[in-house]
Curated annotation (Swiss-Prot):
Enzyme Commission numbers on file: 1.3.98.1
Pathway where it operates: Pyrimidine metabolism; UMP biosynthesis via de novo pathway
An annotated GO BP: 'de novo' pyrimidine nucleobase biosynthetic process
Native species: Streptococcus equi subsp. zooepidemicus (strain H70)
Cofactor section: FMN
CDD domains the UniProt entry points to: DHOD_1A_like
Cystine connections: none
GO MF, one annotated term: dihydroorotate dehydrogenase (fumarate) activity
Cofactor: how bound: Binds 1 FMN per subunit.
Name of the top EC class for this enzyme: oxidoreductase
The protein's name in its UniProt record: Putative dihydroorotate dehydrogenase A (fumarate)
Assembly notes: Homodimer.
Length: 311
């Protein structure tokens, strides 16, 4: 029987597919819909110290090749999501989950993580270092010195499993520099990638979203080559103990297969989930299993990271 089961840190998952933070995860009802689907897990909306309304609407638009958004981190506050995942972990039948968080400053991020450290939650945390859509707030993971300083502080007190969501990098030297920093810390995973920041989509003569004069994060088909490159570059450079979650441009089993071939242990779905709903996990899982069966692969480990190069 072909299996799409996988593992991140000490946590086992029946399926390698899940949602991406920001999609189908704002409310408890949405999270329960992902929980009830074929997805192996869910990640919550990125929770901030206080609830946020986010940017003015319209702030999301589908396009022929994906999507553009400038949501601005709307969420119910980290405590809302922490309560949900803490309650769900009491159920033996529950899946393991990811709690996504970030502060609007380094100090706020530490406040949140210290609260999680002191809580009963034992699951995975995804620290979002890469939101491109908050006006006046840069993507922290592009500042290597600041990222290093923040991780150094965090791991001086935080002992639970923690990973980071990264923006896309485009320069080989940046992969080298980032990996050198990440390898210094006991990260459970890195997630490659968040949307490509500050794209522009135009309808006739006008931008399609309102915030930031129409500038927003690009997702979907547009970003798959960039996402695959980031997954594989970090797979080549990171300590084996740091797993990789692949995110970007996944709407078929073939897309998921390519992420895993590049080194991903799990695969998140964003734009396509927004367009198709939680039933997408059943479809993509079957498509992935069919590809694996056709190639004679029984488990993800049979081909994960085995990308072939031209001789």
């Amino acid at each position: 029987m072909v299996s799409t089961a996988t593992k991140i840190a000490t946590f086992a998952f029946d399926n390698c597919l899940m949602n991406a933070a920001g999609v189908y995860c704002m409310t408890k009802e949405e999270l329960l819909a992902i929980e009830a689907s074929e997805a192996g897990s869910f990640v919550t909306k990125t929770g901030t110290l206080a609830p946020r309304q986010g940017n003015p609407e319209p702030r999301y638009a589908d396009t022929a090749l994906g999507s553009i958004n400038s949501m601005g981190l709307p969420n119910h506050g980290y405590q809302y999501y922490l309560d949900i995942v803490t309650e769900m972990q009491k159920d033996q039948a529950s899946k393991h989950h990811f709690l996504s968080v970030v502060g609007m400053s380094a100090e706020e991020t530490e406040t949140i993580l210290k609260a999680i450290q002191a809580s009963d939650y034992q699951g995975l945390v995804e620290l979002n270092l890469s939101c491109p859509n908050v006006p006046g707030k840069p993507q922290l993971a592009y500042d290597f010195e600041a990222t290093d300083q923040l991780l150094k502080k965090i791991f001086s007190y935080y002992t639970k499993p923690l990973g980071i969501k990264l923006p896309p990098y485009f320069d080989i030297v940046h992969f080298d520099q980032a990996a050198a920093i990440f390898n210094q810390y006991p990260l459970a995973f890195v997630n490659c990638v968040n949307s490509i920041g500050n794209g522009l989509v135009i309808d006739d003569e006008q931008v399609v979203i309102k915030p930031k004069s129409g500038f927003g994060g690009i997702g979907g088909d547009y970003i798959k080559p960039t996402a695959l490159a980031n997954v594989h570059a970090f797979y080549q450079r990171l300590n084996p103990s740091i797993q990789i979650i692949g995110t970007g441009g996944v709407k078929t089993g073939r897309d998921a297969f390519e992420h895993i071939l590049c080194g991903a242990a799990m695969v998140q779905i964003g734009t396509a989930l927004h367009q198709e709903g939680p039933a997408i996990f059943k479809r993509i899982t079957k498509e992935l299993q069919d590809i694996m069966a056709e190639k004679g692969y029984q488990t993800l480990d049979d081909f994960r990271g085995q990308l072939q190069y031209k001789p």
